[in-house]
């Protein structure tokens, strides 16, 4: 579907906007006057003049290079943009089980969604965003990226890889011989939203212990009412996207 260029001067690209944190972030940014380009496999429930949705399978590299790439090129080419944001929220936690039993094809699928697509999006926005517009990038992380959880090797290691990709991009910008790139206002955040009440949590609680030995932890989160609504991390993320000067790279967790 053809779209006109937005009148808003702030553009955010958010993946996984059909539920959970991604949906909450998109709605909050729209309330704050952003134009939001959402990307997800399923249709979006958001109905707002400032929102447009691209249905895309982030594991399909070819689809990234067609409709999503062309729309990003059109949006980021607008000279009226005063701020650009990227929220890499979409993730596939679906490959569970011990390392010795993981299927390499499913591993490739998980890493395509959780690592390859976010890295491609980061590079695309650095390359195409107006150099005078502050660029803020948020990569959603997880406790499983730093702590081992039995049964979550694929998900945790993919999130650890995304964390390192963000750090590497920040180091590249700081060390580049290109003074124009080095002096740009680009900041990256690796953000751990904590225990959020999302479909992913419910899905983890439903798994058999043989597949997810750490299932009891997710059951405890619900039983002890430790789950927070998606709007809580959404506020943190929106605040970072709207922040003035920030460190090139930082890590934060909900409530810190």
Specify the residue positions occupied by each region the protein language model found.
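C-terminal helical subdomain
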Residues: 182, 186, 190-191, 198, ...
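Conserved internal alpha-helix within the Rossmann fold of NAD(P)-dependent oxidoreductases
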Residues: 117-122, 146, 237
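Rossmann-fold cofactor-recognition segment
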Residues: 49-62
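Conserved NAD(P)H cofactor-binding loop of Rossmann-fold oxidoreductase domains
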Residues: 87-96
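Catalytic loop of short-chain dehydrogenase/reductase
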Residues: 136-182, 192-195, 205
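Catalytic Tyr-X3-Lys loop
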Residues: 92, 100-119, 162
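N-terminal Rossmann NAD(P)H-binding glycine-rich loop of SDR-like oxidoreductase domains
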Residues: 18, 26
């Amino acid at each position: 579907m053809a779209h006109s260029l937005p009148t808003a001067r702030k553009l955010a690209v958010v993946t996984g906007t059909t539920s959970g944190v991604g949906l909450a972030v998109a709605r909050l940014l729209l309330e704050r006057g952003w134009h939001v380009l959402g990307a997800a496999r399923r249709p979006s429930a958001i109905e707002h003049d400032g929102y447009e949705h691209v249905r895309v399978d982030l594991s399909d590299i070819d689809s990234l290079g067609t409709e999503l790439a062309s729309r990003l090129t059109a949006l980021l080419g607008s000279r009226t943009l005063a701020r650009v944001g990227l929220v890499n929220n979409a993730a596939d936690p679906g490959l569970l089980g011990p390392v010795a039993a993981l299927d390499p094809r499913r591993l490739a699928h998980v890493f395509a969604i959780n690592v390859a697509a976010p890295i491609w999006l980061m590079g695309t926005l650095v390359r195409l965003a107006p150099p005078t517009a502050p660029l803020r990038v948020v990569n959603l992380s997880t406790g499983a990226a730093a702590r081992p959880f039995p049964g979550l090797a694929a998900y945790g290691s993919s999130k650890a890889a995304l964390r390192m990709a963000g750090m590497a991009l920040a180091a590249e910008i700081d060390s580049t011989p290109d003074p124009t790139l080095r002096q740009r206002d680009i900041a990256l955040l690796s953000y751990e939203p904590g225990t959020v009440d999302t479909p992913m949590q419910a899905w983890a609680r439903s798994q058999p212990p043989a597949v997810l030995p750490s299932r009891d932890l997710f059951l405890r989160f619900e039983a002890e009412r430790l789950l927070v609504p998606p709007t809580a991390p959404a506020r943190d993320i929106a605040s970072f996207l709207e922040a003035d000067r920030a460190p090139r790279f930082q890590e934060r967790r909900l409530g810190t």
